[in-house]
């Protein structure tokens, strides 16, 4: 049985990934989450009946700090790391960018530093955003090799974390995969996220703000 780490497991994307792992793998899953306001506590993972699955281990930890030795020992031999944890509310990144950027960059650096010590790591998957490329001109489709053109501190923090991931792949030969996801929507999403917020504002007859060029 493979052992995997999923960061941000209580978040919107993270808990859907966790649900998929539970249903479609036999993995032992170690969930690392600091339980920020966007995590909704354990409500999301409680809704998918995680606490009755002995394969799932949940740890409350802040990845802005290096992993503690006790936790590292308990995690043991890890095969895959799925790094999903991040602050992602664009408006919050604009109103208070410093802690926002520090969280997303430092958490990625610390989980990478832990991961590079693992002797049997098969894959490190980092979940980034398409927003690192900025707004595309009409008729243009971006490719992975495009230059970053971050339009706000949120996308800049994800772009910086991507660069750190790439540097660890190049320097230490780590097996890193980076995904650039678009806006997501689904069950149990935080009401402050873009699509739920837009829907709510439209229903209330309010002005919709879109951060774009």
Regions found by a protein language model. Give the residues of each.
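Glycine/proline-rich active-site loop of Rossmann-fold NAD(P)-dependent oxidoreductases
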Residues: 159, 177, 184-197, 204-206, ...
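N-terminal Rossmann-like NAD(P)+-binding domain of SDR-like oxidoreductases, especially those catalyzing
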Residues: 1-184, 204
């Amino acid at each position: 049985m493979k052992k995997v780490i999923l960061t941000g497991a209580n978040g919107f994307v993270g808990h859907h990934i966790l649900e998929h792992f539970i249903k479609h793998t036999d993995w032992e899953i170690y969930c690392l989450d600091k339980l920020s306001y966007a995590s909704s506590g354990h409500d999301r993972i409680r809704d998918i009946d995680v606490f009755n699955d002995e394969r799932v281990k949940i740890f409350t930890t802040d990845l802005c700090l290096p992993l503690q030795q006790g936790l590292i020992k308990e995690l043991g031999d890890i095969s895959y790391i799925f790094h999903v944890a991040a602050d992602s509310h664009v408006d919050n990144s604009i109103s208070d960018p410093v802690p926002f950027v520090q969280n997303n960059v430092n958490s990625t650096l610390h989980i990478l530093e832990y991961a590079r010590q693992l002797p049997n790591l098969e894959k490190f998957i980092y979940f980034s955003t398409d927003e690192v490329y900025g707004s595309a001109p009409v008729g243009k489709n971006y490719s992975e090799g495009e230059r970053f053109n971050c339009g706000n501190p949120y996308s800049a923090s994800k772009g910086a974390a991507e660069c750190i991931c790439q540097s660890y792949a190049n320097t230490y030969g780590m097996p890193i995969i980076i995904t650039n996801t678009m806006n997501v929507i689904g069950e149990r999403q935080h009401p402050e996220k873009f699509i739920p917020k837009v829907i709510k504002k439209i229903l209330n007859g309010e002005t919709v703000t879109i951060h774009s060029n």
